[in-house]
A protein has these predicted regions:
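Internal amphipathic alpha-helical repeat/solenoid segments
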Residues: 1-27
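Extended amphipathic alpha-helical scaffold segments
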Residues: 2-12, 32-39, 122-125
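Alpha-helical solenoid scaffolds that mediate protein-protein interactions
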Residues: 3-7, 11-12, 55, 61-65, ...
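Secondary-structure edge/capping motif, primarily at the C-terminal ends of alpha-helices
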Residues: 11, 15, 42-47, 128, ...
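Short, solvent-exposed segments of well-ordered alpha helices
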Residues: 18-29, 49, 53, 105-115
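Long amphipathic alpha-helical coiled-coil segments
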Residues: 48-63, 173
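Extended low-complexity, polyampholyte segments enriched in Ser/Thr/Pro and acidic residues
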Residues: 67-197
Length: 197
């Protein structure tokens, strides 16, 4: 993955002066590198908290690239900032347990719409693949659909990562706190032996 990033940088595949429509069709797939880095690193269980934090950083990288091309809708940008607890300046805000719960309890209508949208994208991708896998690199509709379905996956993954980080933080806090919940029973005083006269 890092080799691909070096190639992207050296060949200047992406530019701040471009719009999304200016990106070559065969280069759209390179926009997904940071996304797949996040997906891959999430599979590691050692140093789990660090792994999850890196996963969020890769999603940030993916989001920032999309933003630089103004690819995302205002609603998507707003949703991302809400999920990552960031204000308009991009600074991390303190979150409450209620916010974490709300992430997992999305509006039912939104979930249904997201499911339908994801299903339509998946069907479109499969249809294009069936028609001719050898011409996929030239098919702009395919790569845009592929990009969009992975944006949805990112939105689905972030709340899960946040919840897992919260759980790890809670466990760490419990371990560090002194065990003062249960007061120790005072030892009974020993009776002094009376000295014989």
């Amino acid at each position: 993955m890092n080799d691909i990033k070096v190639k992207i940088y050296k060949e200047k595949i992406f530019s701040d002066n471009e719009e999304f429509k200016d990106i070559k069709t065969e280069d759209i797939k390179f926009m997904l590198v940071a996304f797949y880095q996040s997906e891959l690193i999430q599979k590691f269980m050692v140093n789990r908290k660090n792994v999850l934090e890196f996963a969020l950083k890769f999603y940030d990288e993916f989001f920032n690239l999309l933003q630089s091309y103004e690819y995302l809708s205002k609603e998507q940008v707003k949703k991302y900032k809400k999920l990552t607890h960031k204000d308009e300046e991009g600074e991390k805000q303190k979150k409450t347990p209620q916010q974490s719960f709300e992430e997992m309890s999305q509006n039912r209508t939104e979930k249904i719409e997201m499911y339908k949208y994801k299903k339509n994208l998946s069907e479109k991708i499969k249809k294009i693949e069936k028609e001719g896998i050898d011409k996929i690199d030239e098919n702009r509709e395919y790569w845009i659909s592929y990009l969009n379905i992975n944006i949805v996956k990112m939105f689905e993954s972030i709340p899960m990562i946040n919840m897992e980080i919260d759980a790890i933080n809670h466990m760490e806090k419990m371990k560090k706190e002194p065990q003062q919940q249960m007061p120790k029973n005072p030892e009974p005083k020993k009776k002094k032996k009376k000295s014989k006269a």
